[in-house]
Amino acid sequence: MARTTWPQILYDIEGNLLVSADQEISKKVIDEVIEKHQIQSSKILLSQTKVINDIQKRINSGIYKEMFANKETAEKVIDIIMQTSCTKLVVRELETLKINMPDTYNHILIVAALSIKICIDLDNPEFDPQQIAKIGLVHDIGKSRLPIEVIEKKSPLTHNEFGIIQTHPWIDHLLVSHYLNTTKSFIAQAALCHHERLDGSGYPLGIAKINNYVQTIIPCDIFDALISQRPYRSEPFTVRAALDILVAESKKGKINTKFVNCMISYARKDKPHYEDIKPSQTNRDATPKINYYGVRKD
């Protein structure tokens, strides 16, 4: 299980002290935070924010222009996001991320959009696209509280530094619970679990039972992280190399194969149905020459 203590003082977007340095983030602490602050944040439709324009830019850039080539579906994705409401404090978190950590902000937007697209294409009545939009848009806001020197480190992380990285799902959970003024938020719980894996090898809880919303988020999260520039590697993964990793992870039972096949379908020009996907059996592209992800200094 990943560490649950936070080495720095943690504040919300309004400057309220939530957690003291080296205090454990637990359900008890979250209960205390909610009881103390009793946040009453009004909601706003995302159609009234700049998030919409920024998502449109993301789905029309790079590989995502190909993945959202079906204009009808792309318009549905945008429409769902426009009709989704968030607390104004969450929107402020996103606005702050856009200024201070634009890469994380853009990552959050495209993960939300891809996850919604999968929901639309699966056409499963049990999926609420607006619910997954909300989860996608908060799944990494906790990274805004991580030390920038750790986030932008180009050399291998120490075990302690990686432990700090692993706290961000807990910070996601704390912030969302705080802003929604409840410890029983499905959205906050989903944000907590976005680094879990179906074989129990993920973090921070190390659980194997993961709800379908989170299972949808996971391959989208991994894919964009791989094809994006990161300080700890020499260049991004190619689309093919990134998809190969998703396939390998699904074969190991770590992530949902159905959702991985959706991602493969989106990247192909002929857009086959996800049930007809037959992934390549061999790695087709080389990985970055320098990649310190998963490498520890001590």
Q: How would you describe each model-predicted region?
A:
Residues 28, 35, 136, 152-155, ...:
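Alpha-helix termini
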Residues 5, 13-14, 89-92, 141, ...:
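Residue-level signal for pocket-adjacent positions within structured domains
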